[in-house]
Structures are given as structure tokens and as C-alpha cells.
Amino acid sequence: MTDISSNPEGEVLLLDKPLTWTSFDVVRKVKNTLRIAKIGHAGTLDPLATGLLILCTGKKTKQIDQIQAQEKEYTGTFRLGQTTPSFDLETAVDAERPYVHLTPAEIEAAATRFVGVIEQTPPLFSAVKIAGQRAYELARKGATDTVIKSKTVEIKTFELTRIALPEVDFRVVCSKGTYIRSLARDLGTALSCGAHLTGLVRTRIGEFRLADALTLDAVQALAPPRPATDDAARRPRRERQQKPPAPRAGLEFYAAQQASAAPVTSAADAPATTN
């Protein structure tokens, strides 16, 4: 790849977004690493999703709207029988309902109801603007009566690739603006058991595929060398103090859950209990 920072035409970069990183985290990292003046992303991914994030630099930023409008493909996992306010693992379970009576045929039949052009209501924990504020800002302040307008989206494919209750793995091909977290909620409602999203990977945007994406480590390897100066050669370089990463608002519960789920060894090796 050519020196991205000096390419006047710009680049379309495919990135594999890490778990818990925001889309802006990735943009900032790439901007600083490659020293790019103009850069933006073509479609947000939630912090708890991973996969394809497209970044455009220089003149290629004019293509952002065109790329955003293309269909998306996702794979992931729903957890039946439990709901959360955010429809994913960002918040604690707020309700549990029976699910063991459901058959694969019933779950498949419910999924088919969401294929095609549908009306979908975005999650309260989303970037949708309400009276000038992001919905997630209102949600984190405890607002529960916020009304979010539904919008028209298209689910082109909703394939259930594995059913191992309470988990259901899926593949979805959908239009711009579709919330997979909302699809989890709606499927759970259709099954009268509730559901939330426990894992999500974006595998494709139009013809751009995750298989062709760079990791952030690969981006680091593309960093242009810093120009040496006489002053820099004479002066010893000061070691920068490593700052602890800033806490990401909204992921405190997820981080605590992951910490508590860390394996603990014991002499007894007692089996874990289930709810």
C-alpha cells in the first residue's frame, strides 16, 4: 500500500474493529498513527460489536454517503429468555421468561416474519437524536419514557444458523439503518420470551468484506517514519507517561461482568450452577 498520509486522492480503508472500541476510537487511532488530515468512517458499529468498519481519507471521504447506503451483512448470537434495556450486554438483565418450550420450527417461523420491508423502532440506547440529544444520553440519565419513532428498513436475509437454546446464531443481510439489537428485541417479543444480543460481527458492506480488513496492529505497521531533525538528534527523547485508558461511558456494567466471569481455579473444581 502507498503512503496513505501523502496520497492526494485518499484511500478507502477496511478495518476490523476490536471489541469495546467505539467507531470514533478507531478513526482517531488511524488518524494519529498514519498522520491523516481528513478521515471519516462509513457506518457506525456499536462498541460491543466487532467487524468491518470502513474509513475514507482525503478525497475518498466524498464516497462515505454512497458506501453507507449499501446493504450490510452481520453474523451474531441472540440469547432467548432474557431482556436488557439496551437489547445487548451493555446493561443488566431486567426480565426473564420461559423459553425451553420453544421448538426450532417455532423459532424459524417467528424469524420469517421479519424478512422484507418492515417498520423497526431503534433502541433507546442508540445515537438517534431526540430534541437535540442523543437517545443514549437520555437513557444513561435514567429516562424511561422517551419515545423513539420507528423507521422503515429492509431485512433481505434472516437465517438462523444454529439453535442451541437459549442461544440462537444468525446471519442477517439488511439495509442501511437496521438495528440488529432491535431485531433481537422484536424476535424475543414474537416468541413471547424476550431476547437480547450477545455477540455481533459485521462481515460485509456492499462488496467490501471483513476478510480483506486490516487489524489495528497492521495499521500500526503502516505508520510513516517520523522525520529526524538536528535538534531531535541532539536531545534525548523524553519518555511519555502511559496514561490509563479513559473509561468508556456505558460499558461499566459490561466490564464488571467480564471481570466477574474470569475463570477462578479451585481445588474442588465445583461445577457452575445455572439459573
Residue ranges of each PLM-predicted region?
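Catalytic/RNA-binding core of pseudouridine synthases
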Residues: 1-275
